Amino acid sequence: MDELVKRHGSTHFANINYGYYILFLSIIYIILLFCLRNYAKITTRSTRFFKKLYSLNPFIHLSILLIAIFIPFYQPHLNKLTVYYKRLGRLSYTLIPLNLFLTLKPNWFLPSQCTYTDFIPIHKWLSRFITFIAILHSILFLSHWSSSSDENVSIAIKLQNPKNVLGLIMLIPSLLLICLSIGPFRRFSYTSFYIIHNISNVMLIFLTPIHARPGVAIPYLIINSILLLAIAFNKIFFIKKSELLAKETLPNYDNNSSLVTIRLPRSALPETFTPACHIRISPYQFFNPLYWLLPSHPYTVVSLPSDDSVDLVLTENIKKFAFRLHMERSYTIINQFNPSVPIACLNSSKRVCIVCGGTGISFGLPLYRYFSEIIERNQRSIEYLRLIWMVKDKSQIKILEKLNSLKYDLEDKNFTSNFHVFITQYSSKSSGIEDSSGSGYELEDLTPEDPSSIGPYIFGSVNFGRRIEWTTDLSTFVEHDNDIDNTWMLACGPSTLVESANKYADKSGVRFASEIYTL
């Protein structure tokens, strides 16, 4: 030890306290998250900043974290650049516990106040930051070694140390991960991104303690290992084995995919679950290494606890190697995860508008059914309820007929009267059909050329060849003098739709919750 201190001077241990500071900062941040979601309340009078803070906006949260991280980063008495190069490396490792905490599914510390989807944006950007500073740490040292005037310092000499070789080995998957995390590459092959992501994480967690000097095994490796065990526990003990009861496909959803309904046995989920909850499905059993290496696939549950089966609506890519569910094959159902809809909305909302696009109907339908049942049973006064579904083509509406959980509801006019459909690519000129934005139109009357292509159900309105006009179509939704804090806009679908709904909700001063269906 004396020899080590003599060679490096007091700077060798200069970053240890900074690492403890980052760990302490992570703990404080988690406690603040707990307090924010347990004791703070969002109202229409809340500031825009506080709303973004509460909704875990990644820009707000990461800005706060980065300010706290870098305030003590520079210290005037530390004048050797290599001290800061090392500090970047220690920073990347000491942030991993916080990042792993954000990936817990479910999060035991915030079981009812947050869902794992709430943390995805923060986790995504924090992961990129960790990877970036780890890469920067490596590049700065390589640059320092290559440009040093000291004859005892060079890349060749430094790489004779196995610990430095480990650092170079970890650099390779980190560089690849940064490239694959770019949107177009990630969407092109999410599986490749996920594999590299897992490999890079495991290498960073378990090789860094060997590479780092001074060591980081205590307490960081111990904490990281405990969190990894918690993640593994969730993926082992909160699972069920199941086969498909039925699968029906609506072809030509778009050029590359088909719209599909899946029916699972009711036993796939526990006795009670939250409307619009998620499940994740893996084609492998937990003892198969591919169960851990490859991604599971998230789906929103269309059914309610009272149904006798579990329905899913999803798109399946027609590409050769795309993941698809098959009959007569066993799957692992991983947990059931709460949706992004706050408990306050489910328990106390009085005016609710649900807007969804495409397969976002899997989010909208269970929530609409949940609130409809509350109205039917007079459990609570709900003054306004509307479900709006936007589809590209009228044939997509046939998917409703294939849902076992809707077999009675679609025949109930009280249920469908507040269900409004927008068929965005329909050409009324070619069929001679006028826009039916009024109420009480029967679909088979609106499509005399092919009644069976939509079905004989009466909706509140069927709107052809256009998208929703927020202020016009929702003119009676917002009543500023009538409990605006219990007025909710819920949205699900492509990011463009969700962003439009969010802007409308923000402008109208109503509460908002959403899920975006994208990678």
Swiss-Prot record:
It is found in: Membrane. The chain crosses the membrane at residues 16-36, 53-73, 91-111, 129-149, 165-185, 192-212, 214-234. GO terms for biological process: apoptotic process; reductive iron assimilation; regulation of actin cytoskeleton organization. The keyword Lyase does not apply. InterPro entries: FAD-bd_8, Fe3_Rdtase_TM_dom, Fe_red_NAD-bd_6, FNR_nucleotide-bd, RBOH/FRE. Residues 237-366 form the FAD-binding FR-type domain. Keywords: Electron transport, FAD, Flavoprotein, Ion transport, Membrane, NADP, Oxidoreductase, Transmembrane, Transmembrane helix, Transport. GO terms for molecular function: ferric-chelate reductase activity; superoxide-generating NAD(P)H oxidase activity. Residues 88-207 form the Ferric oxidoreductase domain. It is an enzyme of class 1 (oxidoreductase). Its EC number is 1.16.1.-. One of its GO terms (cellular component) is plasma membrane. CDD domains: NOX_Duox_like_FAD_NADP. Pfam families: FAD_binding_8, Ferric_reduct, NAD_binding_6. It is a multi-pass membrane protein. The keyword Ion transport applies. Probable cell surface metalloreductase. May be involved in iron or copper homeostasis. Belongs to the ferric reductase (FRE) family. AIM14 subfamily. PANTHER family: METALLOREDUCTASE AIM14-RELATED, NADPH OXIDASE. This is Probable metalloreductase AIM14. It comes from Vanderwaltozyma polyspora (strain ATCC 22028 / DSM 70294 / BCRC 21397 / CBS 2163 / NBRC 10782 / NRRL Y-8283 / UCD 57-17) (Kluyveromyces polysporus).
